[in-house]
Design a protein with these regions (language model features):
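Conserved SAM-binding motif I beta-strand of class I
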Residues: 5-10
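Short SAM/SAH-binding signature in class I
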Residues: 48-57, 83
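C-terminal substrate-binding/active-site "lid" region of AdoMet-derived donor-dependent transferases
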Residues: 61-122
Length: 122
């Protein structure tokens, strides 16, 4: 039987409402903890290991990209062997996951032009 293993985080209220509706219609609402808010805050309150991460934010702006900021917060919480997907290919994010010192193995996939798949190895 399915057991809840972690939350779904989303910033946009409409996407949260759609996710809740879709999960309810599928009979899965009891298995997902949907948290609305900025991932840079909500990720700090997970309270356990993370099994899978999908980073699909907005690239751009000055300073570290949103993907890089999120990865620096969540990386210590990802279990060894845990996969991470990012579909924007921000250069500072790629530098992080491709640096062996940060504990990931990473490769680009030919999807959407800039999808990166990573596995936490240490």
């Amino acid at each position: 039987m399915f057991q809840p293993t972690g939350p779904l985080l989303e910033l946009a209220p409409k996407k949260v409402a759609n996710a809740r509706r879709n999960l309810a219609e599928a009979g899965l609402a009891d298995f997902v903890d949907i948290r609305q808010g900025d991932a840079r805050q909500t990720l700090r309150e997970l309270g356990g290991l993370v099994d899978f991460v999908l980073i699909d934010g907005w690239p751009g702006g000055k300073g570290p990209s949103l993907a890089r900021q999120i990865m620096e917060i969540v990386a210590p919480q990802i279990r060894v062997g845990g996969p991470v997907m990012n579909d924007n290919g921000e250069q500072d994010y790629l530098a992080y996951v491709r640096d062996p010192a940060d504990g990931f193995r990473s490769m680009s996939l030919p999807l959407k032009g800039a999808t990166e798949a990573s596995i936490k190895v240490s």
